[in-house]
Amino acid sequence: MLVSKIFSNIESNIRYLRLTSPGLFMTASTALKDCRFVAFDVETTGLSAIACRVVELSGVSFRLSRADSQTFSSLVNPGQPIPFEVSRIHGIDDAMVKDAPSARQVMADFNDFIGSDSILMAHNAAFDVEFVKVEMERVGLVPPANLVLDSLTLAQVIMDGDFRPANFKLKTLAEFFGFGGDEYHRALADSIYVQKLFCELIKITGAGDLDMLVATGALKPFGQWVKQPDKESLPEHVRAHLSLLESAITSRGAVKLTYQGEFKSTRTVKPQAVIASRGSLYLSAYCTRSRAERTFRLDRIVEAVLHN
């Protein structure tokens, strides 16, 4: 019953992927044993990809047809304090990341590690994807275009009826399948749990081809896990600001910015990147007044003028 329910969605989901990412699409008959997967996880300073930063990024590259795997793991200097209540969750504090490499270096290395041919996976993928995307855009890197599998969605679709855990948290699922450990909320440990969870879920279905993953709706191109703003529907003044800011980023020029936050303020900034997050556009810029990086929501910019 479950397998037939899943596979009844194959045709529509394959059609969707062909339309939305024709260059990425793998045919439904692609054997899972021929795919390279990368399970990955991020640990952060908080929940907002705009206001917060990545403090650890890890991944496990593997194939179902082989017992060996390769790992990537690095702490990241977030350039901001890690709140105490967040450190209590993942155990990473300011002292641990003080001498860690920058986000630019770690994100570039991670891009090299995953390559363009792998299928990425994460548990609650939208969270991890958004942080990686925003961090990469913030430092001028192009986010990957790989397909991404959400192991949370996959588990929710497959583990139905009587075969259903108390909840779908990664820790609960790891213990449900008998591979739970002592360490959680560290990026490498959680990446390994995601890898093992995926293998268990594949065993349940007995699927050997990519079509099952397509059918569940748990597989999307990287960029589609994050809500993108429709630039064409932006107000005219926002589009004008966007054009000017993109020009300033290219020329590495400065901009005099009037911004409506809690209070209206005017400052000179050096634009670094325009970032999309949760359906809104943001400017990441170096503020000469505060002498630090700041983020501004584009629709709250009152005026933007090139500053000589």
Language model: regions and residue ranges:
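Conserved non-catalytic scaffold segment of RNase H-like nuclease domains
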Residues: I6-A145, D160, L170-G181
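Core beta-strand-centered patch of the WYL/Sm-like small regulatory domain
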Residues: E232-N308
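Short, glycine/acidic-enriched loop or turn micro-motifs at the edges of active sites
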Residues: T44-G46, T153, Y193
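Acidic, Mg2+-coordinating catalytic module of metal-dependent nucleases/exonucleases
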Residues: D117-M136, D162-R164, F168-K227
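Acidic two-metal-ion nuclease catalytic site recognized across multiple nuclease folds
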Residues: I6-S29, L197-K256
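Residues immediately flanking
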Residues: V42, N124, S151, P271, ...
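Short alpha-helix plus adjacent loop in nuclease-associated cores
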Residues: L149-P165
